[in-house]
Amino acid sequence: MSVANPEFDPVFKPLMKLIREFHEDQKPVLGVCLGSQLLARSFDAEVYPLNDLEVGYTPLYITESGVTDSLLTGLSRRQTIFEWHEDTFDLPNGAELLMSGDSCYHQAFRIGSTSYGFQCHFEVDARHIDVWIKEGREDLVHYHGTGADEVERDIRRQMTRHVGLSSRFAYHVGDRWIDLVSERC
């Protein structure tokens, strides 16, 4: 499923309308991966294929704007977070870039004070990743061919090293997200 694919517009257009309504009412919005792409497109930004599968634990960098953002403040500038996506997006007009990456630059952004998009999958744990590896085998083979087994092994090695730190990031952002929702709702 891709926000860049017009075939899914009958599903996505009502969601994007709801996202805009929430934003206009200052109700917090948090989009992760597909959700970040929907948020970007809701504000007329382009969503398009990355021409690669960004998969595995990836170094991401909190920007100057991110350092002072209420969800990210207090975190180390460099984070290693799980990724599994093949699309990316331009930033909507007026959005603040909060996190960036090397192969997919736009990793997290905020529009206004309550609408957030995260391209990375900070919400997943080892259990989720195991399922995604099994169910996403076709993607791994499509993008990596005979190297798919090595990519899978790399992901599993990375998991043992990074899943704990990634979980801390998730709890940090999640706690602050709950605070934001409590303030606004």
Residue ranges and their predicted role:
Residues 4-7, 52, 162:
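Pocket-edge positions in alpha/beta enzyme catalytic cores
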Residues 7-13, 34, 42, 93-94, ...:
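Generic recognition of short, well-ordered alpha-helical segments
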Residues 1-30:
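Flexible gly/pro-rich beta->alpha loop and the following alpha-helix that scaffold active-site loops
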Residues 43-128:
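Pocket-forming structural segment of enzyme catalytic cores
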Residues 126-185:
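Acyltransferase
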Residues 12, 16-20, 72, 174, ...:
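Short amphipathic alpha-helical segments and helix-helix/interface helices
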Residues 11-15, 47-48, 99-100, 134-136:
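Glycine-rich, phosphate-binding/catalytic loops in enzymes
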Residues 22-46:
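Catalytic nucleophile loop
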